[in-house]
Structure formats: structure tokens, C-alpha cells
Amino acid sequence: MSDHPSPERGAVLSADDIARLLPHRHPFFLLDRVTALEPGTSAEAIKNITSSDDVLAGHFPGRMIYPGVLLVECVAQLAAVVYGTAGALRATGEIVGDVADRVGYLAEIRQAKFLKPVVPGDQVVFRLQSGPRVGGLISVTGQASVGRDPVLTVRLAVTERDA
């Protein structure tokens, strides 16, 4: 991460910043921008869906729908940003230390409800809120919406990486 806040409009973390935090790469690097971040607690991010997204090539012929499981993965990647930056994000926006070593894993999809299809041209807004920690698992709740319409609610369990 640079020593200066991202120049992108509305970005707390740009796509380049997120790429420095997460081990994911194309085609599974999914978040475009983090627009709000409270390390260790909550965040908001966006993903723009385009007809050129690789996953839409065959999902579904004649009616492109973004796969629901990848919406869940977006929430899991946002959880990795939230917990990876805990204790490492300075007020200047600078990340200190090697955050990638702290990014954990998706352990469980406890509940997922897909409320509306997501299609090319949609901008999906993801919101994540931290929940209780039980042993090595952290509960999180996430929502996704397109405009004012909710498209996903999900409850996950994530882990921190073993030191």
C-alpha cells in the first residue's frame, strides 16, 4: 500500500491496494474497491459485474447470471480484508507489516439466501459485520445489494491463519 490515500473516488482501498492484501489473483480476485473499512469490525466494498467476466461465459447461455457462490466469495474476501488489516492500518491509509500472512480462510457457509439474480451492468455493494469469536472461528454476517435491492444475505465462519 502506498503512503498516500488512494486517488480513486470513494475508495478507502483501491483494487491495487486489495491485491496487496489478498493472495487471490485473476480470475478469483473479485473485489473492485473497498469504500468503508473499520479493521477487525466491518467494511463495505463494491464489485462491478460486466459481460466480459470469465465466469459468465457459460452461466447461463442466453441469460447471463453472476454465480451466487462467487457473491459469497466476495463477502469472504471482504472478511479477509477486515481481519487482515486489524492492527495494521494507520490513519494515513498505510498498511504496516505483512498482512497476507494474517489472511485466514473461509471455514463454513452457515446460511446463504440468494434474493435476486445479479446480471451484467450491476454494481454490487457488499457489507460485512463482525460477530462473535468462538475458539478459532469468527462469525460474520454479510449482505449484498444492487441499488436498493438486496440480492444476498449470508452468515459465514472464517479463521485466522495459524502463526
Positions of PLM-derived features:
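Catalytic strand-loop segment that frames the active site of acyl-thioester-processing enzymes
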Residues: 24-66, 70-71
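Hydrophobic beta-strand-centered segment that forms part of the acyl-chain substrate-binding groove
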Residues: 3-6, 10-12, 79-125
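Compact, glycine-rich, soluble single-domain proteins
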Residues: 57-84, 90, 106
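Hydrophobic residues on conserved beta-strands that form the core of alpha/beta folds
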Residues: 31-32, 109, 139, 153
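Beta-strand-rich interaction surfaces with strong enrichment in secreted/lumenal proteins
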Residues: 19, 62, 113-116
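Terminal targeting signals and extreme-terminal segments of soluble enzymes
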Residues: 15-22, 54
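Conserved positions in beta-strands of structured domains
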Residues: 32-35, 110, 115, 129-131
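HotDog/MaoC-like acyl-thioester-processing domains
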Residues: 2-11, 23, 39, 117-163
